[in-house]
UniProtKB/Swiss-Prot annotation:
Source organism per UniProt: Rhodopseudomonas palustris (strain ATCC BAA-98 / CGA009)
Name of the molecule in the record: Homoserine kinase
SUPFAM superfamilies (UniProt xref): Protein kinase-like (PK-like)
Reaction(s) catalysed (UniProt annotation): L-homoserine + ATP = O-phospho-L-homoserine + ADP + H(+)
Keyword flag Cell inner membrane: no
Keywords: Amino-acid biosynthesis, ATP-binding, Kinase, Nucleotide-binding, Threonine biosynthesis, Transferase
Amino acid sequence: MAVYTDVAADELADFLSRYDIGDLLSYKGIAEGVENSNFLLHTSRGYFILTLYEKRVARDDLPFFLSLMTHLADSGINCPQPVADREGRTLATLAGRPAAIISFLDGVWPRKPSVVHCAGVGQALAKMHLAGRDFAMKRANALSVAGWRPLFAAAEARADEVQPGLRDFLAAELSYLESGVWPSDLPQGLIHADLFPDNVFFIGDEVSGIIDFTFACNDLLAYDVAICLNAWCFEADHAFNVTKARALLSAYTRERPLDAAEQAALPLLARGAALRFLLTRLVDWLNVPEGALVKPKDPMEYVRKLRFQQNVAGIRDYGVEIAGAVA
């Protein structure tokens, strides 16, 4: 979450008058994240989140995201629910941006994910995948392999400003992943596609909610697992934590076993996941709007993760002989 577009108090008051959420007591921008402008609303009826959708989020995709949250919540997945205005609409316009109000979830995201947290997110991800099986709406993943070349083109001229040689490193990896090695015949379904620690809330050791579905789409289910391996299983010094990976994979596969092809493909999927986030972070790092209340994330973190994944020989390197085995 972040703030790119500010909202004047009188403009916000007029906007909120269309909703039955009580009187506004206070509001503040939320600086975390990199994609949309988000505000915490405190009203006489509690707390809500106001999101103004920016950048990579197409307005035509918003009904998908909002309907998905409703579907998952109805299926027992703890996630925010869209709040309708008095006309029954969940999508509106504020400050020239598409906007929605969603419910507030209790909990905090883990700043230093533990093994227990990794197990929790593995289980929650699998349950979300299962709950998404009967969601009727579809959305292609615009940030899968076909979407990486345009990102590279947007950043390549200045990539070496971040690290000398980065452009050639990215070009070589992209060419490899575009060479026909990327799998297309693995189980597919609804994926979150951005399940980082700041998108999972915990109360104690229990997952209390999953947030931020603005990258959700239909793609390889194991790709979502690979994204989580990269996001949850590296330490602050960039070392890969096999114990965390084992916990995440074991918890996931207790709910939804990975088949043999998914297990074999997981290291390749993790390479692709690392490149995808490296590229989007690089573009963001090089193009932060002046004066924006935003904290761009370091692309070099994902350079290191990609280098690790390039050297993974198989799923054993993630701490398991067969995904689903409990250590």
